[in-house]
From Swiss-Prot:
Pathway the protein takes part in: Nitrogen metabolism; urea degradation; CO(2) and NH(3) from urea (urease route): step 1/1
Entry binding sites for substrate: 221
Post-translational modification as stated in the protein's UniProt record: Carboxylation allows a single lysine to coordinate two nickel ions.
Required co-factors: Ni cation
Modified residues (N6-carboxylysine): 219
Active site: 322 (proton donor)
GO cellular component: cytoplasm
Main location: cytoplasm
One Pfam family this sequence matches: Amidohydro_1
Protein name per Swiss-Prot or TrEMBL: Urease subunit alpha
């Protein structure tokens, strides 16, 4: 006779199952398990008197014959493609399978074979997401990387050379010398890294040199002169070498207006940074570019979400980052032209509509590198409060909204930069960059981070304690942070041309180097759950934003979740 167990006891033992709902941190967002790939009564769980023992849940199968290196049991997977309960197998640092783990000799429908060579990570009661991807990094200081990793980010793309004045303002690693040194520096960090060259040159040879040196993309920034001619020159090189172009457009409209930039882009694929405009771009109407099919629009996190403090903090940040002088009236006017309540409010709604597709940090250059995931889900929470459930959702759950927002920091930046074959989602064959969250700490503080199949970061107690849990408990680097494990668990993204020219070997790189690919044939329709193309207009006098004739506006929040409740210092 089968044993019956109530839902609450089952969830406490094996994690939530189909139909169970989970609250995300202290937000008003709730997810509901859509499907459970484990088998009731045949679940695997590790521990004394539990299932994963020799001859029971652990088989006699060797690693060579198919046993996985690591199994994650009973995890609640949250990804763009679904919110499901499953076991996850990892082998050779990659996701081997998502399904049912166990011993095929005594259990049915086993997709993931557990053997003596298999380690176990208990996923019960945890949300599992893909490692997040931040595509707007100013590499100002190396300490950013640990901060980002501790927040759940496992891939960082951007530019810079350290705290140089140019890097403080722009995400460019200019020239082959600096690109080479940054690629060599990347060897030291447990993070997937890639670097953008400076895209501002009408002489294509300057751009080609950087791509050949290993740049995985090119960045056009107004502080270096983003004119129609440099835009065209940069995109010509990108099309030839299959790298992405990121753009920060001309706030002052000196070389033309947003229409002139759209004309210069000429239908070619481009990733627009801080597309609302507070981070920079044609004032006041750069936001309308999100309606172009070839444009992959992103936000940076200082304007995420719109709160009562958003406008006040921006002016000083902007003056510092862009090397402006508060004694010069023109510099003050430049800064003030970028900070508009109306467009920031509209940005919230455009994200909720799926018209803005990506969220990144703008690290130490107005943005906060450790708050990308937090700010993303604060925005989702705000929009639920102010706009109610999406049409695809119900009063029971916010699954579609949550999948839309997780896509903005995982799969969509991966697609935009040609690395989605390797990272950006929990799918068979991809690198096992995975983040575990307690639901009460979701999007705030990860419980554990797996990098290339090995544990790289975890909440950990006193190392001198008799068990792992006594305080002080805080995030600490784990073994994949060190030595050759670091080298083999993390990756560097370069242009295909540079790999073909043996640049990794010439520079003495030990990390596995991966070529970006398919950056030029994509458009917004390829971005998951965030491909809406609204017809945007901006009133030049009031800065009010309209989508297909409808005013987009919302009020700022006085209080956000995932904030002081979690950060006491």
């Amino acid at each position: 006779m089968s044993y019956k167990i109530d839902r609450n006891t089952y969830a406490q033992t094996y994690g939530p199952t189909t139909g169970d709902r989970v609250r995300l941190a202290d937000t008003e967002l709730f997810i509901e398990v859509e499907k459970d790939l484990t088998t009731y009564g045949d679940e695997v769980k590790f521990g004394g008197g539990k299932v994963i023992r020799d001859g029971m849940g652990q088989s006699q199968v060797t690693r060579e014959d198919g046993a996985v290196d690591t199994v994650i049991t009973n995890a609640l997977i949250m990804d763009w493609w679904g919110i499901i309960k499953a076991d996850v197998g990892i082998k050779d640092g990659k996701i081997f399978e998502i399904g049912k783990a166990g011993n095929p000799d005594i259990q049915d429908n086993v997709d993931i074979v557990i053997g003596a060579s298999t380690e176990v990570i208990a996923g019960e009661g945890h949300i599992l997401t893909a490692g997040a991807i931040d595509t707007h990094i100013h590499f100002i200081c190396p300490q950013q990387i640990e901060t980002a990793l501790a927040s759940g980010i496992t891939t960082m793309l951007g530019g810079g050379t350290g705290p140089a004045t140019g890097t403080n303002a722009t995400t460019c690693t200019p020239g082959s010398f600096h690109i080479s040194r940054m690629l060599q520096s990347a060897e030291a960090f447990p993070m997937n890294l890639g670097f953008f060259g400076k895209g501002n040159s009408t002489n294509g040879r300057n751009l080609i040199d950087q791509v050949e040196a290993g740049a995985c993309g090119l960045k056009l920034h107004e502080d270096w002169g983003t004119t129609p001619s440099t835009i065209n020159s940069c995109l010509n090189v990108a099309d030839k070498f299959d790298v992405q172009v990121c753009i920060h457009t001309d706030t002052l409209n000196e070389a033309g207006f947003v229409e002139d930039t759209i004309k210069a882009i000429a239908g070619r694929t481009i990733h627009t940074f801080h597309t609302e405009g507070a981070g920079g771009g044609h004032a006041p109407d750069i936001i309308k570019i999100c309606g172009e099919k070839n444009v992959l629009p992103s936000s940076t996190n200082p304007t995420r979400p719109y709160t009562t403090n958003t406008l006040e903090e921006h002016l000083d940040m902007l003056m510092v980052c862009h090397h402006l002088d508060s004694k010069i009236p023109e510099d003050i006017a430049f800064a003030e032209s970028r900070i508009r309540r109306e467009t920031i409010a509209a940005e919230d709604i455009l994200h909720d509509m799926g018209a803005f597709s990506i969220i990144a940090s703008d690290s130490q250059a107005m943005g906060r590198v450790g708050e990308v995931i937090t700010r993303t889900f604060q925005t989702a929470h705000k929009m639920k409060l102010q706009r109610g459930p999406l049409s695809q959702d119900s009063d029971r759950n916010d699954n579609y909204r949550v999948k839309r927002y997780i896509s903005k920091v995982t799969i969509n930046p991966a697609i935009a930069h040609g690395i989605n074959k390797y990272v950006g989602s929990i799918e068979k064959g991809k690198i096992a960059d995975l983040v575990f969250w307690k639901p009460s700490f979701f999007a705030v503080k990860p419980e554990l981070v797996v990098k290339g199949g090995s544990i790289v970061w975890s909440q950990m107690g006193d190392a001198n304690a008799s068990i792992p849990t006594p305080g002080p408990v805080h995030g600490r680097p784990m073994f994949a942070n060190f030595g050759q494990s670091l080298i083999n668990s993390s990756f560097t993204f370069l242009s295909k041309n540079s790999i073909d020219q043996n640049i990794p070997k010439k520079l003495g790189l030990q990390k596995n180097c991966i070529a970006v690919e398919n950056t030029r044939s994509i458009n917004k329709s390829h971005l998951k759950l965030n491909s809406k193309l609204p017809n945007i207009s901006v009133d030049p006098e009031t800065y009010e934003v309209f989508s297909d004739g409808e005013l987009l506006t919302c009020e700022p929040l006085n209080e956000v979740p995932m904030a002081q409740r979690y950060f006491l210092l």
